[in-house]
Amino acid sequence: MAKKITLLGSTGSIGTQSLDVIRAQGYEVFGLSAHSQTDKILQQIEEFHPKYVCMTSEAGAEKLSAALAGRAGAPKLLTGPEGLKTLAAMDGPDVVLNSVVGIAGLGASLAAIESGHDLALANKESLVTGGHLVTQAVAKHGVKLLPVDSEHSAIFQCLQDKESAKSLTKILLTASGGPFFGMKTEELRGKTKADALKHPNWNMGAKITIDSATLMNKGLELIEAVWLFGLPPEKIQIVVQRQSIVHSAVQYSDNSIIAQLGVPDMRIPIQYALTYPARVPGVVPELDFTTLKLLTFDVADEETFRCLAACKKAIKKGGLGPCAANGANEEAVKLFLEDKIGFLDIGRLVEAVVDSDSFGGDYSLADVYECDRMARAFVRAHL
């Protein structure tokens, strides 16, 4: 029987690449969700015939409802953030893949876990903003949390030898360096969104591409790695690997290092999360070592790229510190993409929010959303 998948965020970059994998493996789509891209999800409905679809924007839901009216075999339509959580919690799928962008994915991640579903997680913000809540829920409900980020998938793959994993001493978390690698503050001052959206190696959505340019993405991934693999941040070293061939590595107590390599294609980690623990042929070409002329490794420049420094401060503060950093960044990136602030303002604002409070202590889901709201308000008040 074909594996059934609920795919949240199906019209984004990760979502469409996930459907490439689902198509190639002959999996069944149980549910799909999108925010507002009605035309795109209509095409997906016609090909994959999901039983349920959720549109989280009101306008998108109204447009999709009109398009599906009277259509034979149309999926049941759910709407809004509550509809997204309902879809994530529904009985039926074998795996829920959450590729929603931003903190909007947290509630759906928790709903899937609490309903007993294995969760393939591309929404790193679930762990960044609510890592304590997510890991606690995973332990309570005994489900698998399968990383989809290429770096965390690489680390996860390197740790499959459970005996060796007990001797883990360090994670080498790789970064591409983004489009502005090697530049200093003065060179970055006039960079536009068009400049920042030119990633050298990866095909990604706008928000994560900007995060790559500021190195915020690597800061978020550092926080994510702390929650996924149980190492303190000082045991996670960020290494710039410009070719995006070495996706990350782990170091053991005897100082041996195991790395995962492959072409820079997100369908590899997506497929591994969906087929785990099996490995099967897929749609990605093999890496030809004879064509690799150079693999370089460099230090990440935290002095210039302040988002990375801010994320390190945030995870060391603990509590809601990472949530505050994430909320500030989401708001700042939105303003940057609207041409309302400059590129360097993103790092300035994220760091200012992290420095504004101690953020320590336990927290609830309501606390997470309130912290996110306050961080965004802080950004808007300090432009």
Task: Identify the residue ranges that each predicted region occupies.
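Catalytic, metal-anchored helix/loop core of enzyme active sites in primary metabolism
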Residues: 1-383
